Amino acid sequence: MKNKKDTLRKAGWLLLGLVFLFFSGGDQPVWIAVWLAPIFILRFFRETGAFKAFFVALPLMVAVEMIADKGMTPFPSFKILLFYSGLGVVYSLLPYFLDRVLMRWIPGGLQTLLFPSLAISIPFILGSYGSWGAKANAMDDLALLQLVSVTGISGIAFLIYWTAAVVNTIWEQRSNRKIAKNVSVAFLIVLAAVYSFGLIRLRSDYRPENSMLAAG
């Protein structure tokens, strides 16, 4: 009975991740779905195990990505579309896989930095599709987007993936209030600093004389 409940719970995490992943794609991605999808996919990996989670999630995520991006991908045949969609999903799953494998070697709250670091560095090392599918594409909060002026779009992605790692660490350490509190405080301080920087920049860096009418 316990095994059945565990299986259903893990399936629930993956299902939620896939639903939010679907709404993260397409030509009108929903920003809240972009933030939530990694939380549940990471939860699925951490409860399931690296290899099993990878091979279960891979075909399902490929299907979701292909449905969400239908009509957007410039490939002449289904086989080519399937190949590149699969390759893209493999790239996107590697951080989850490696996080599950390596997290045991990382002490305490520092574990929260492993997943976002992997999620940013792996596409950089292996190559990616440029800004296609970038997390920042779904964001329309101008204060938050000011971070791009310093870090590029990778900074937005780091925050999104770090959120997933922080939420999962708090979930796992809910009986250890000290670690959960320290992780939460550190995350909120950084998020507040990023947002404050954005608000200040929006209010102080606007010069009408340096602007031009782009449309209308």
Regions found by a protein language model. Name each.
Residues 2-215:
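Membrane-embedded alpha-helical bundles of multi-pass enzymes
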